[in-house]
Regions:
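N-proximal low-complexity "stem/linker" segments adjacent to membrane-targeting elements
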Residues: 1-25, 255-256
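A conserved acidic beta->alpha catalytic loop
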Residues: 16, 25, 29, 35-47, ...
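Acidic helix N-cap motif at the loop->helix transition within catalytic regions
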Residues: 20, 41-52, 92-93
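Short, structured coil segments at secondary-structure junctions
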Residues: 29, 52-53, 130, 155
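Conserved donor nucleotide-binding strand/loop of the catalytic core
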Residues: 31, 46-76
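Catalytic metal- and UDP-sugar-binding loop of GT-A-like glycosyltransferases, i.e.
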Residues: 59, 83-85
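Catalytic-site signature of metal-activated, phosphate-bearing donor transferases
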Residues: 66-72, 79, 83, 90-255
Length: 257
């Protein structure tokens, strides 16, 4: 067991296909694992978590940031491991986390390798993909962004990158990707409305096309073959949906739960 005491906080909803493996990796690092389960979850996620003997709190959805901060507040330790429910730390990363002595003025980034179905995607702008997965809750909180929430601090913190990989099983198939992207598009549209922002004419007319070119050509998505094309195509659709929902939604309260 690592000398530093960690708490693992994982927010989840309908993650029965991945949550078990995520928990098993965390159990190699800490005995304090808290699952903050969206109370609308209706698959077998809750039972799987309880079978693994972790703490579980069912909670009304308050957004990604709200539920993550809630979980961190209920962690028993200051250092918080924060994998997504579809992420699994590999053995190299786990060993590194056992060896390090985290510094209070640092946050720790880990390299995420995303899988589309069973294919590891190493281009298309998806890899390398460094994300903070270890932080001290005394110095950082999640901001209130509706999508792509991030950690913020009142004073500068140094970023330290750790060796190893976070395996990210994000999309079971293309339909699953479309479902997730539709949620992301609604969240982005609401974020613009919340900030009283209007997409530029360029973004409205050319943004989707630029995103396809960026993913498939500039980010070498063509090297990912058919998978790369599928990702680029859905990136195009995502950008069109962001504009569509921004136009359709009332320019006031949030429209997505």
């Amino acid at each position: 067991m690592t000398e530093t005491k960690y708490s693992a906080v994982i927010i989840a909803k309908n993650d029965e296909s991945t949550i078990g493996e995520c928990i098993l990796a965390m159990q190699k690092l800490t005995n304090d694992i808290l699952i903050v389960l969206d109370d609308r979850s209706d698959d077998n996620t809750e039972n799987i978590c309880l079978q693994h003997g972790v703490r579980l709190i069912k909670k009304t959805w308050e957004g990604y940031s709200g539920n993550k901060n809630f979980g961190a507040d209920h962690g028993k330790n200051d250092w918080i491991l924060c994998p997504d429910a579809d992420e699994v730390f590999d053995d190299v990363l786990i060993q590194k986390l056992k060896e390090i002595n985290p510094k209070d003025d640092q946050v720790y980034e880990m390299n995420r390798l995303t899988y589309f179905m069973k294919t590891a995607v190493k281009h298309s702008g998806w890899f390398p993909d460094w994300n903070i997965r270890l932080y001290n809750k005394k110095s950082m909180r999640w901001n209130d962004n509706l999508v792509h929430e991030s950690l913020e601090s009142t004073y500068p913190l140094r970023r330290q990158r750790l060796s190893g990989i976070v395996r990210h099983y994000s999309f079971r198939d293309e339909n699953h990707m479309k479902e997730k992207y539709d949620i992301y598009a609604k969240l982005r549209a609401n974020e613009w409305i919340k900030a009283n922002k209007r997409p530029s004419i360029f973004k409205m007319w050319f943004g989707p096309y630029f995103r396809f070119v960026r993913t498939f050509i500039l980010k070498l998505g063509f090297l990912d073959g058919k998978t790369g094309y599928t990702i680029a195509k859905n990136d195009f659709i995502l950008k069109r949906k962001e504009i569509y929902y921004w136009r359709q939604f009332p320019k006031s309260a949030s429209n997505v739960q």
